[in-house]
Amino acid sequence: MSEIIHRSKTRPVRVGSLTIGGNNEVIIQSMTTTKTHDVDATVAQIHRLEEAGCQIVRVACPDERAADAIPEIKKRINIPLVADIHFDYKLALKAIEGGVDKIRINPGNIGRREKVEAVVKAAKERGVPIRIGVNAGSLEKRILEKYGYPTAEGMVESALYHIRILEELDFHDIIVSLKASDVRLAIEAYEKAARTFDYPLHVGITEAGTLFSGTIKSAVGLGAILSKGIGNTIRISLSADPVEEVKVAREILKTFGLASNAATLISCPTCGRIEIDLISIANEIEDYIAKIKAPIKVAVLGCAVNGPGEAREADIGIAGARGEGLLFRHGKIVRKVPEEQMVEELKKEIDKLAEEYFAKQKEKEAALKGNAVE
């Protein structure tokens, strides 16, 4: 089973039922593409995101119709809700009043101090954190005049400007993002931010692109950032169905052992030795394990000679041969199965492992409760 790597120490911030930062696992976030005022469409998309593994969802809040929809949306979903606000402090107040779990707004863009104070007061009263979102493409004019073009230094300076406004009002439930479409710039900005302050960081590569190119760009950039222990929430920005963003985020986190509730697939690239339809089998198993909330590593390999040895790290797997397959656990052969039964037998073994994992988790929870009572 995969081990969870804890992130760099950051200040913990509560967002609804979740804690962001403070050595907790990296949380997956996405954003709806519906018109927020269309409650039914928005809720339906959020339910699809939840099913895919999204843990926090953000909605655009560009006008009063969107802000008015917040209470009904909140009532019908199961994950924390974030309202994305630009400039209009009244929309922030309405979203907070409507029960949103977090707002994304830059206090320096709201206007007069009394407007900022009103938002901070409302956020404090309801325990709603604020995410400061710095974007390389929309840095303040004074920052661009100082540095000439978007730089990591300028992005961190912009973040600190907004942070200090909130800190002066004794508000510290802050999360920060420093996004850029340039991967190297994003990496440098997040590195500098991590050295500069201890607020949780929401990481992402903005405007990454289409499903194919955006996935690669995000994996390269966020992989580099996560490998340094930086990042507390993650969002993949794709010109695609937001469910795809969640799938990509889960795969990236699984690669680093940062997803405690996701199964992983290992499959070989195929070669002339293969006697089974490995590609279709691998795709079927990948779809099957996508919704399994247990850290199981599954292998689908085409060669019975090298397969078990190549997948010693896998919890369970199959290696194909002509007319049959080898079912193995941790590199040791369990039994042979006919080719036509390989997939179903593997699915049964995956289900058994998942049940074992959930049973152990329940035992741990019961033991912890027992210790607490004593």
From Swiss-Prot:
InterPro entries: Dihydropteroate_synth-like_sf, IspG_bac, IspG_bac-typ, NO2/SO3_Rdtase_4Fe4S_sf. The lineage of its organism: Bacteria, Bacillati, Bacillota, Bacilli, Bacillales. It holds the Pfam family GcpE. Its EC number is 1.17.7.3. Belongs to the IspG family. PANTHER family: 4-HYDROXY-3-METHYLBUT-2-EN-1-YL DIPHOSPHATE SYNTHASE (PTHR30454), 4-HYDROXY-3-METHYLBUT-2-EN-1-YL DIPHOSPHATE SYNTHASE (FERREDOXIN), CHLOROPLASTIC (PTHR30454:SF0). Pathway: Isoprenoid biosynthesis; isopentenyl diphosphate biosynthesis via DXP pathway; isopentenyl diphosphate from 1-deoxy-D-xylulose 5-phosphate: step 5/6. It catalyses: (2E)-4-hydroxy-3-methylbut-2-enyl diphosphate + oxidized [flavodoxin] + H2O + 2 H(+) = 2-C-methyl-D-erythritol 2,4-cyclic diphosphate + reduced [flavodoxin]. Its cofactor is [4Fe-4S] cluster. It comes from the Bacteria. Binds 1 [4Fe-4S] cluster. This is 4-hydroxy-3-methylbut-2-en-1-yl diphosphate synthase (flavodoxin). Signal peptide: none annotated. GO terms for molecular function: 4 iron, 4 sulfur cluster binding; 4-hydroxy-3-methylbut-2-en-1-yl diphosphate synthase activity (ferredoxin); 4-hydroxy-3-methylbut-2-enyl-diphosphate synthase activity (flavodoxin); iron ion binding. Keywords: 4Fe-4S, Iron, Iron-sulfur, Isoprene biosynthesis, Metal-binding, Oxidoreductase. GO terms for biological process: isopentenyl diphosphate biosynthetic process, methylerythritol 4-phosphate pathway; terpenoid biosynthetic process. [4Fe-4S] cluster binds at C268, C271, C303, E310. The keyword Iron applies. Converts 2C-methyl-D-erythritol 2,4-cyclodiphosphate (ME-2,4cPP) into 1-hydroxy-2-methyl-2-(E)-butenyl 4-diphosphate. NCBIfam families: ispG_gcpE, PRK00366.1.
